[in-house]
């Protein structure tokens, strides 16, 4: 039987075919995750996240149809603080707009969970999954289910007896980071099943690439705090913040550590500064990879990652200067996911393909 060798890993034609099919499934999940995060971003930017006040995992898929059903949903929304404080003049038609955003976000979440579960069952029944990756593939639908639970936990922070007019920024950040962890995991798995013509990089390059992924995730976390606190609406100037390098009020909250999570000014300041640190780290990484494995695909990817980080920072600046319109906010959020995905692909590629275990 003909065989194919990948980084000293020998594959039969059937194994190669199975890996490609699993990759297509994983990339489908990845694209759906991208869509969910972007719809979630639009849901947040349009103030739609609290429009559905109940969690019905099964029959919640069916939206209101009759006028009475719509009135019932609207009445439930009228009981929460967001309506009482911000939207007392909202009409039923205006409510329908925010309802559809949240409904679409939830239905997409259920759909990606279904795709993940059914795909896993299909590949398992047809014996296409190699033993050494079965548990990792099983983890995908589990992570997606957990993300759904975290999503409801986030929404619940703005319901009931809460006096919040939006969800908790802490829970929003956790929800986004959990989504990013799903994206990281799926990307890492799919790239591990790819074909590589170049040998793996040394341990130093591999570890550095992994740390870069972590730093990008930290920057996304601070971006989520910016979103949750609406911190992009303040100090819409660059490179200075209201004409200052260190603006007044950075440490106004007591205790001091609270400023880094609840002070909009401080959170935006940290998000800005960490982006500069991230770029410098990416440049050092590119130089290190070029020195370790000169003129290799690893080095080329590291350079391209630097370019992507600069482009993402530029997008962030434009978004800030325009006071975060929905379109630019979504483009900036989508750009962050693209940078994250590419960094994970780069990290996984430095390791080579998964070994075959019969």
Swiss-Prot record:
Q: Look up keyword RNA-binding and say if it applies.
A: no
Which pathway, per its entry? Porphyrin-containing compound metabolism; heme A biosynthesis; heme A from heme O: step 1/1
Stated EC number for the protein is: 1.17.99.9
Q: Where are the transmembrane segments?
A: 22-42, 107-127, 133-153, 172-192, 208-228, 269-289, 302-322, 324-344
Annotated keywords: Cell membrane, Heme biosynthesis, Iron, Membrane, Metal-binding, Oxidoreductase, Transmembrane, Transmembrane helix
- Give me the reactions it catalyses: Fe(II)-heme o + 2 A + H2O = Fe(II)-heme a + 2 AH2
Q: Where in the cell is it found?
A: Cell membrane
Positions that bind heme: 271, 332
The text of the family note is:
Belongs to the COX15/CtaA family. Type 2 subfamily.
HAMAP family annotated for this entry? HemeA_synth_type2
Q: What is this protein called?
A: Heme A synthase
Which gene carries the instructions for this protein?
ctaA
């Amino acid at each position: 039987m003909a065989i194919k060798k990948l980084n000293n890993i020998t594959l039969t034609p059937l194994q190669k075919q199975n890996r490609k099919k699993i990759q297509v499934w994983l990339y489908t999940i990845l694209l759906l995750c991208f869509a969910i995060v972007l719809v979630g971003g639009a849901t947040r930017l349009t103030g739609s996240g609290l429009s559905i006040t109940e969690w019905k995992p099964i029959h919640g898929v069916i939206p209101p149809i009759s006028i009475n059903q719509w009135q019932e949903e609207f009445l439930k929304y009228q009981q929460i603080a967001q309506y009482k404080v911000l939207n007392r003049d909202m009409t039923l038609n205006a409510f329908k707009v925010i309802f559809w955003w949240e409904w679409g976000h939830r239905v997409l979440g259920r759909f990606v969970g279904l795709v993940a579960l059914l795909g896993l069952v299909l590949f398992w029944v047809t014996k296409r999954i190699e033993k050494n990756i079965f548990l990792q593939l099983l983890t995908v639908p589990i992570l997606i289910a957990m993300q759904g639970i975290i999503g409801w936990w986030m929404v619940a922070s703005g319901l009931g007896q809460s006096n919040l007019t939006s969800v908790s920024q802490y829970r929003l950040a956790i929800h986004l980071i959990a989504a990013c962890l799903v994206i990281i995991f799926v990307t890492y798995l799919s790239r591990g099943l790819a074909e590589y013509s170049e040998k793996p990089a040394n341990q130093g390059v591999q570890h550095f690439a992994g740390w870069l992924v972590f730093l990008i995730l930290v920057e996304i976390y601070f971006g989520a705090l910016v979103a949750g606190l609406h911190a992009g609406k303040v100090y819409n100037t660059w490179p200075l913040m209201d004409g200052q390098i260190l603006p007044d009020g950075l440490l106004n909250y007591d205790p001091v550590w609270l400023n880094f999570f609840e002070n909009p000014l401080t959170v935006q300041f940290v998000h800005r500064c960490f982006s500069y640190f991230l770029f410098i780290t990416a440049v050092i990484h590119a130089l290190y990879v070029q020195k370790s494995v000169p003129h290799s695909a690893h080095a080329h990817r590291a350079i391209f990652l630097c370019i992507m980080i600069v482009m993402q920072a530029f997008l962030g600046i434009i978004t800030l200067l325009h006071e975060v319109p929905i379109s630019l906010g979504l483009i900036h959020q989508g750009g962050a996911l693209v940078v994250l995905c590419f960094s994970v692909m780069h990290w996984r590629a430095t390791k080579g393909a998964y070994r075959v275990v019969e």
